[in-house]
Amino acid sequence: SLEVIGVHKDGGMCERLVLPARKLHPSEKLTMEQLALVETLAIGCNCVNRSASSSGDKVLVIGAGPIGMAAIEFLKVAKTEITVMDMNETRLQFCKEKLGVDHTVVFKNDGTEADRLREVNGGELPITVIDATGSHVSMSNAFQYVSFTGQVLYVGITTQELSFKHVTIHRPELTIKASRNAVPGDFKRIISLIEDGVIDTDPWLSHQASYDDFIPEFPNWLKPETGVIKAVLHMN
């Protein structure tokens, strides 16, 4: 029965909207820019909650986009050892320098990824793999990067079929999970973490534009070389 305004129901672009007060998550401390990030971060929060990751766990995040980065924020809170894999080296550098992940691995699609993951993780594969790519190819191949009795968690979404041999998950006794959304408690927790300075939103807010500047600015945001992480549109 989950319904999201602007997704399942019309009204996401209304100037004014009447909602039950219990659906709102206010903060007297955060800026509007910070509040705009809460929903994005909630996807990562729920994902890490579903993974039940704990301190010292070796975790691989595949995909250094906003969803993968959101997961990273809460893996940091859980004090896990984080490796990020992506084909975009600029994004990997951002994750290393701005988000403080432990290791990065460039995806080259040459069959060396598992060995390189072992190299940076002390000879072991991660116990948890979070696939945030939304690519059915990546999601079908994620099992080769996880250790025995580990888990693969899908937070990226695809409409394509996933294909893998049963023995791929049966022999190493893997667990498969999915993470779709967030719950009200996640929003309250995220607001508190930002208010307390545990999560730094500054690296996320890479670009901003006024309402009048949005039309000429938007095409630039679509260019990879622009380095957009999250862009904020000011409506005033």
Question: PLM features: residue spans?
Answer:
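A generic alpha-to-beta junction signature in SAM-dependent methyltransferases
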Residues: 53, 121, 133, 146-147
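Glycine-rich phosphate-binding loop and adjacent beta-alpha segment
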Residues: 136-196, 234-236
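Mid-domain Rossmann-like dinucleotide-binding core that forms the NAD(H)/NADP(H) cofactor-binding site
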Residues: 30-109
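Helix N-cap at the beta1-alpha1 junction of Rossmann-like dinucleotide-binding domains, i.e.
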Residues: 89-91, 111, 136, 159
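Short amphipathic alpha-helix with an adjacent loop that forms part of the alpha/beta core around
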Residues: 110-123
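Glycine-rich phosphate/adenylate-binding loop and adjacent beta-alpha elements
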Residues: 1-24
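Short SAM/SAH-binding signature in class I
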Residues: 124-132
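C-terminal hydrophobic helical "lid"/dimerization subdomain
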Residues: 140-141, 184-236
